[in-house]
Amino acid sequence: MKRKITILGALFVIAQSIMAGSIGVGYGVTTPIYHNDKNDYILPIVDVEYDKFFIKGGSTYGLSLGYRILEEDNYVLSLYGMPFGGYEVKNSDMKYGYKGIEDRDTHLMGGIELTYYPNIYNLQTKVAAEYGEEGGHFNFSISRPYHITSNLTVVPAINYVFYDSNFVDYYFGVNPNEVRKPGGEKIINTFNGKSAHRIGVGILGNYRVNDNISIMGFTGVTKLSGEISNSPIVENDVIYILGTGLIYTF
């Protein structure tokens, strides 16, 4: 269930403005989405730019590679690709009674994102659309950095994601071949995925130890809509997140 880092990664999106030109590593724990026991994750962090090209990790779906096609004082429009979009769900990671599912794989996804600074209370807003072979989603986030001291920055944020029916059906749907299979006796019904959403709030703190080293902490909560949480392979509809990270800034 390695792709649960996507939930963790959503918190890093809100703080990219304070992590530009950085690499690092994060560690986080979450409430399981699926019926599995794995709830701790290592999250690579990277934010590197050259001219208008960029590589970012710790974003909503891990690694993204892109290009800023428009860049003005108050907005940036970018195109990017995500080699590992979606979720990786392995039946071997599932709890007893749920191991009869077929594996779900990550897929190449493409996206477009508009970052807009409305010049109101130092807010930052982001709107993105991402799509791949197994469907896609629309993302919206709003955040504001608070510079508590010269070394400490705190960034609260709200994030909303809308998933189309193809995406939900592939990653959370249950087809007849997965019902009551050996190892999957607790899956007794099929489930057809429909369009769904999740909404989350989070807060990230970044403490700069010196010019190059920062320590980060983050926490948040995400609520999944019933179109996801009612799936037989989903365990929780509220996902809690807690973690920390170490960042090196160039």
Which residues fall in each region the model found?
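Transmembrane beta-barrel strands of outer-membrane/channel proteins
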Residues: 23-29, 48, 57-59, 79-85, ...
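Cleavable N-terminal export/targeting peptides
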Residues: 1-22, 233
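Internal, conserved structured core segments that host functional sites
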Residues: 89-134
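Short glycine/proline- and aromatic-enriched beta-strand/turn motifs that initiate or cap beta-hairpins
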Residues: 20-65, 166
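Flexible, solvent-exposed coil segments and beta strand-coil junctions
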Residues: 22-28, 43-47, 91-94, 116-123, ...
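Solvent-exposed loop/turn segments connecting transmembrane beta-strands
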Residues: 31-40, 55-60, 71, 104-106, ...
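Outer-membrane beta-barrel transmembrane domain signature
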Residues: 52, 63-64, 130-139, 143-237, ...
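Repeated loop/turn-to-beta-strand initiation elements of outer-membrane beta-barrel proteins
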Residues: 21-23, 52-56, 75-77, 120-124, ...
